[in-house]
């Protein structure tokens, strides 16, 4: 997929529905923080992919055949640096799709993905720069980055960076330790190396821009 295409629907997804739910407290890295239930629904073109969800239960499903661009899923707004996202379910795609943690930073404006399963490798795009790798959660991940010039974003038409971690051992269930990816990306400019990046939303999502497929996921974090 062209990187510009990804951003076109990601922008609209940034305006997806969000409603706060109860949270409990947990300790992370010596700091008291809140561990939230799902409070954000990502739904861009979900009607083209039979998107159904139960926000309280943290589950969603989708099925598509040659769809327009869509991105759907569940997560949190705002995101954070220390969340470990757990996901479990099924994902099958003939082409042009990801199953991934997905989110944005507000400042510096940045789009990011931790790709757990896929039928398209974003790091194979000729415009992507492979900068390294990181080992986390039982697998190696290839890291690549890309700059989008004057493209749609959660802040309108902007120039911004994209970061991707793409898992070698594809999977449909497990835990994603986000701090491992963020720390690895910071070596390549993510968040300008800030200890506490300015997060916008952060979700586990299914994205497709062609082909046929289906997904059914349970998400928590």
From Swiss-Prot:
Pfam families in alphabetical order: Glyco_hydro_11 (PF00457)
EC id = 3.2.1.8
Q: Which PROSITE patterns match?
A: GH11_1, GH11_3
Task: Please list which residues make up the signal peptide.
Answer: 1-18
Q: What induces it?
A: Induced in presence of Zea mays leaves and by xylan, and repressed by glucose. SNF1 acts as a positive regulator through the release of glucose repression.
Identify the pathway: Glycan degradation; xylan degradation
The record's annotation in SUPFAM superfamilies points to:
Concanavalin A-like lectins/glucanases
The chain's disulfide connectivity reads none
Q: Where is the GH11 domain?
A: 23-220
Q: Taxonomically, which superkingdom?
A: Eukaryota
UniProt GO molecular function:
endo-1,4-beta-xylanase activity
Q: What happens when the gene is disrupted?
A: Reduces the rate of xylan degradation and growth on minimal medium with xylan.
Q: Give the record's glycosylation annotations as residue positions.
A: 117
| Residues of the active site | 111, 207
Catalytic reaction equation(s): Endohydrolysis of (1->4)-beta-D-xylosidic linkages in xylans
Which leading EC class covers this enzyme?
Answer: hydrolase
Q: Which UniProt keywords apply?
A: Carbohydrate metabolism, Glycoprotein, Glycosidase, Hydrolase, Polysaccharide degradation, Secreted, Signal, Xylan degradation
Q: GO terms for biological process?
A: xylan catabolic process
Q: Which GO terms describe its cellular component?
A: extracellular region
UniProt-annotated location(s): Secreted
Homology family: Belongs to the glycosyl hydrolase 11 (cellulase G) family.
Quote the function comment for this protein.
Endo-1,4-beta-xylanase involved in the hydrolysis of xylan, a major structural heterogeneous polysaccharide found in plant biomass representing the second most abundant polysaccharide in the biosphere, after cellulose.
The protein's name is: Endo-1,4-beta-xylanase 11A
This chain's source organism reads Mycosarcoma maydis
